[in-house]
Amino acid sequence: MTTRPPSLPPGPRLPRLAQSALWAVYPGALSRYCKRRFGPTFTLRPLGIGDVVVVTQPEAIKEVFTGDREVLRAGEANAVMGPIVGKHSLLTLDGERHIRHRRLVSAPFHGEAVRTYGERVAQIAAAEVDRWPVGREFPIRPRMQAITLEVILRTVVGVSDERRMERLRTLLRKITQVGVVEMWIVWAYPHLIEHPVVKRLSTLRLMPEVDRLLYEEIAAHRAEPDGRDDVLALLVAARDEQGEGLSDEELRDHLITLLVAGHETTTTALAWCFERLLRHPAAHLRLQRELDEGADERYLDAVLNETLRVRPVIDAVWRKLSAPVEVAGWLLPAGATVMPSIEIVQHSAAFADAGAFRPERFLEGSAGGRASHPYTFIPFGGGARRCVGASFAMMEMRAIVRTVLERVSLRAPTARSERVKVHHITLVPARGGRVIVTGRRRGVPRAETACTAAPRAEVPETRRPALA
């Protein structure tokens, strides 16, 4: 047993306000600078959150993901999200309650249950894609958001009342537009959430109506359970080992987690997929050809995985320490927050030519390029807290990308990469992933027609500003 006192790794001495501002706007740039300056494990001190220890090495990340869950508490770290997602959300639960809820919630998001939704997702995507203008530049992220929101409302919540559906669409679009300043206030000063002025001016003012609509849908599902195959119907029917189901409040919290967190992350991943693909003509051409020829989805999966690697949707995940614990050789004190950096580990030397967009690295038998350590690729987190909706998200992205490329030919308006911008908790294309539809595809034309207007040369990718 060690007798050394807990301590923190070194970190920048900037004032807390300056660290908060840099972390809120340029999280990746700040982390990259600190890694160069202080090494692979360092401490940030933003306002209101306390000491945040960032770990960037696979072995240290493994220690965080596989360590004692009673000490490394994800729910406590996410507690500031409680006013939106609720106290029963998988994001905010710890311990036995998290285990119970995860078991109940997991079933609809795995295996055959997920595969049955693929055709429905494709139909929703096709209806949206057929409305896209030809020959005019537009950001693809809002279009992806329209698709993913509809998928969530129809396949997850199973909303059948059109008036309820339209109102939920409107409210959820507003909620997902929360700005960096409001988000930072929530993270840094959670006690302000209960202030009447903050409630009136923030997106929290919308939550009572969202809750009312969700409770109406839950009641409708309980009253008429037969003939429904949406996720909510499966959650209503789910029972634990004691035969207990989920309460209305618990169902509400899981639904709002999926609505607010789930569809926003998938939206962003899809926007980055097209932003990357359209700037890499060889990958675009190969994917188009394989889809046209009815090949399996291995290369499509490789494109999606490489997108999630080079453009992670969130910068990091975190755990709050309830007791001292050793991570990366440091005995960290209770009360500190440990934050595995998704972006840094996925751009590490573990990947050959890590900055390049190379889907082939994810194909079995490819000529190198893919890291062998399992904790170098963590877009959905890891361990017992790995995203419960990961399989659903991958199914959804496959169906949407396939549908888009089957129905329209796309090109990027410029060869220059879009920079990364912080949009509350997600890292989005700064210009929304702008695209141009060059034509509608009738039948399945030769794959080459989809890529003729792609940029001829790859312009070096622009990274978030480095800190000197």
Short names for language-model regions:
Residues 340-368, 451:
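Conserved cytochrome P450 K-helix/beta-meander segment immediately N-terminal to the heme-binding cysteine loop
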Residues 265-290, 391-408:
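Cytochrome P450 catalytic-core helices
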Residues 35, 125, 173-174, 292-295, ...:
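Cytochrome P450 proximal C-terminal region
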Residues 2-8, 73-81, 97, 113-268, ...:
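Cytochrome P450 heme-thiolate monooxygenase catalytic core
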